[in-house]
């Protein structure tokens, strides 16, 4: 296993385009409604996924209880697969740079797996042969063809395996046959097939690791100032890694933060000594070096604010937050997984939100620079 040097300075089936209509605006973004519970009365499940073309994938329940994976960009949505056909259950979706929605699904008769494209035409991996079942959900590169998943094989010494693939040969990234004891439920992959994940070793240390099949690089681990890490780190197409961790500061206090690993060094992006008390479950990082996360501000003199942010200033870096106007209503709340790594290389952000008028809806936030190009 190759370990990078880490500094002590602290500081992740192409569809036809239809015209998208913005429904509301903040100072830096306009918002395009992808779907709401008017069309999906049985509910829409978070999180949602976004690719570089602005296509958003989500799981929703139509009239009659038909559940499916759907894709839209603002206008009519396309059904990728639903329970009126082969599949009986769907997990959280992804969407790759080819426009193919990727998803976990059960087919009945104890058969299930990860699939891509219309009606799951491409099988990423199924629970046949050596594969017993799966853990976590699929993550796909928004700019490439690769997807990564965690699976549970039948071999006792390999209780967990992370693999990546694009519908062809599946590549083993990491497993628990050696020093690792627990692997990330939600690894992430970039356009070149490099996978980032959090893992705990059998000696109770833990860290953030990157691999593409073969030797792994250690981005950060608990041999230094870091004391713990969260699952779901992000990786961009340059191989930079954004992760959430806890660290001991110079005063011996434990603080939480978002940290960036780039070219063997680590710097602090944001931490809990600032305006935010929490940074959500799955921060995002794009090729421009922009970040996005679902955060909650500290409640010192005002009520805490939950929303999606792109930096440390809750006002200047706010994309959308509770009590903001949106689509003829106001934002009443976010689920824990309203946002999960759904930032693309154009700076667009997809998310699920609850509105004061009773709707639950999926939106894409479009930065004004993107719309003006």
Model-derived features: where do they sit?
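Bacterial N-terminal signal peptides that target proteins for export
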Residues: 1-11
């Amino acid at each position: 296993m190759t370990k990078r040097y880490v500094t002590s300075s602290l500081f992740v089936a192409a569809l036809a385009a239809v015209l998208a209509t913005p429904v509301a605006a903040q100072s830096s973004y306009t918002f395009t409604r992808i779907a709401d519970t008017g069309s999906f009365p049985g509910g829409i499940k978070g999180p949602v996924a976004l690719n570089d073309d602005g296509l958003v994938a989500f799981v929703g329940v139509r009239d009659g209880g038909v559940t499916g994976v759907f894709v839209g960009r603002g206008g009519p949505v396309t059904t990728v697969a639903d329970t009126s056909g082969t599949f009986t259950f769907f997990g959280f979706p992804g969407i790759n740079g080819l426009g193919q929605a990727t998803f976990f699904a059960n087919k009945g008769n104890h058969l299930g797996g990860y699939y891509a494209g219309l009606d799951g035409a491409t099988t990423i991996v199924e629970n046949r042969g050596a594969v017993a079942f799966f853990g976590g959900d699929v993550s796909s590169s928004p700019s490439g063809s690769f997807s990564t998943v965690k699976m549970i094989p039948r071999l006792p010494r390999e209780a967990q395996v992370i693999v990546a693939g694009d519908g062809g040969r599946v590549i083993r990234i990491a497993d628990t046959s050696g020093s690792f004891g627990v692997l990330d439920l939600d690894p992430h992959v970039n356009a070149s097939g490099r996978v980032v994940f959090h893992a705990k070793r059998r000696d109770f240390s833990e860290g953030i690791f990157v691999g593409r099949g073969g030797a792994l690089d250690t981005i950060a681990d608990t041999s230094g100032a870091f004391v713990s890490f969260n699952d779901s780190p992000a990786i961009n197409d340059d191989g930079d890694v954004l992760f959430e961790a806890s660290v001991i500061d110079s005063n011996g206090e434990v603080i939480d933060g978002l940290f960036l690993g780039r070219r063997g060094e680590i710097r602090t992006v944001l931490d809990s000594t600032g305006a935010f008390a929490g940074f959500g479950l799955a921060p995002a990082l794009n090729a421009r070096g922009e970040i996005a996360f679902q955060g909650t501000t500290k409640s010192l003199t005002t009520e805490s604010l939950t929303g999606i942010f792109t930096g440390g200033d809750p006002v200047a870096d706010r994309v959308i937050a509770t009590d903001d106007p949106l689509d003829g209503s106001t934002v009443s709340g976010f689920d824990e997984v309203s946002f999960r790594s759904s930032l693309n290389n154009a700076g667009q952000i997809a998310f699920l939100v609850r509105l004061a008028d009773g709707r639950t809806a999926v939106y894409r936030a479009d930065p004004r620079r993107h719309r003006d190009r």
